[in-house]
Amino acid sequence: WRAEYYKRRAQAIQNRIDHDLYKGSLVKRGSGTLVMTGNNSYTGGTTVEDGGLFGFSESFGSGTVNVNGGVFGILSSFDDNFTQKGLLNSLVGVARAPMQKANVVVNNGGTYAIVADQNVQVGSLTFNPGSHVAVISLTGNAFEKAYRGEDQVGTVTADSVKGFNENALVTPDYALVNHTVTLDGNTLTGVLSKGDKTLADYAANSNGVSVAKALSADPALLGALADATKDEVRKTLSSLANDIHVTANAMTVANGQSLARAIKDQAMGIDGAARVSDVDGGRARLWVSGLSNWSKMDRSGASKLKSDFYTGLIGLEADINANNKVGVFFGAGKTKFKGGHDGKIDSNDLHFGIYGQSKFEPVRLDYGFAYTHQDRDTNSSVFFKDQIFRASPSYNAKVAQIFGEAAYTGLNFGSVSIEPYAGLAWMHLSTDDFSNDIGGVKVSTKFESQNLAVSSLGARVKVPFEVGPAKLKAVADVNWTQYMGDTRGKAKLQSGALNAKIRSEKLSAVAAVGVGLEAQLSKRAALGVSYYGAYGGKIKSNGVGATFKLAF
């Protein structure tokens, strides 16, 4: 019975074939592009929902082509490099016998593509409300030629054209070439011509201009962007000009000042030198300190970069004599740099250094050396035209600084003392280079080292008081800090002929205020807490700290 069933089934199929009962249809889905070059006779119609569908006018059977989404276009010729058939040509207008021509209806969300350098014929061509028309190039070189000043023209001649003037919107908005489509009789003519804009015109800031000029100097990269839209060029420039790394370097310098301040504060005590005199017994002291600092720094044409800086420190100090002491410290923590859509950097930090204090009444000197090592992991994206690439480099940054401060301790008004001071620091920051693979192209970021001088002028006011048996001291601190030297983070973006300079905003003057409170817990123990806020034209920060000290 099975043999009989299959025999009858085969006969039924053959009968439908012999009497042309199979209609057949084509539905194009998915983001890819399909090119058809055969002379097809299916009658069930063609529907385009997504991606691209191109072919000869005779390739789409006798049914209607409905373009509901994606892009559809007719070709007069096609160089078949995929199946190695070479140059193929449409039979419409060439063959002696009349050939069927595609009847096309472009609906809301669909795009009809006029292919530059090709002149084609269709049956009817209808544009419904919400439809689009574009001039494109399947090879891409038409846009390069247009940008060089060679107009690129394509035409579509139809038996009838409906709804073009009323409904069709010419898209997309190309960045570097002008894009026009006109209707004359039943012929649509699309033209690509050189525009009056350059890549630099779409840059949001000086970093973007630098990237744009570098891209324009590389024929291959410029050619790749010749058919980019305005939004794609803006995204490309903004992405490649991302200053999150160099801004992180500038903020690391500012965080280094917070670290030095924490060391000096614990050395003298937030309340002055009271820890040495009030904490009895022993000339050596073990201390632990926690520091948190939250900062924001401006970025040209982008959202601010936020920095969350957390550090724990442990140190040991000893008196050399009544007027001199030295100490060492070690610490670890994290810094989180957050740049919104431009990405983030997570850093594991290590700190160590030495410090000292000397008194030459009525002058006190505080000085030291600090070194910070950052192990940074990045999570960001790079846009190039209509593509997106993940960029997650890991690299190291190092900061070394020598700092010193001279304070005058002779202004006492009863129990209240005023302590004017001046400070100076030298800082050196270096950062490892890294590279990203962007679509198979190696793009390197090479950092410039920074050498800075940091000066500060300020005054502290100290007021001791008692609450029951507890001894406390309150401190207020105001100062003005000035950064000098290499105050911008700088790097070079390099790949082939691409060589663009990326810079952060400038660290300049900062006004700061601090308040602190210290409590004597016992003869050997003291606890201090503090707040510090710094406010500059480009950077603002707020921080809190706590220090516990034990003499032995």
Could you say what each language-model-derived stretch is?
Residues 222-413, 528-532, 536-539, 543, ...:
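Outer membrane beta-barrel translocator domains of Type V secretion systems
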Residues 406, 410, 418, 423-429:
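Solvent-exposed flexible segments
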Residues 1-67, 190, 208:
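Extracellular repeat-rich scaffold modules on cell surfaces
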Residues 326, 353, 357, 412, ...:
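Outer membrane beta-barrel transmembrane domains
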Residues 1-15, 22, 138-312:
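Outer-membrane translocation/initiation segment of Type V secreted surface proteins
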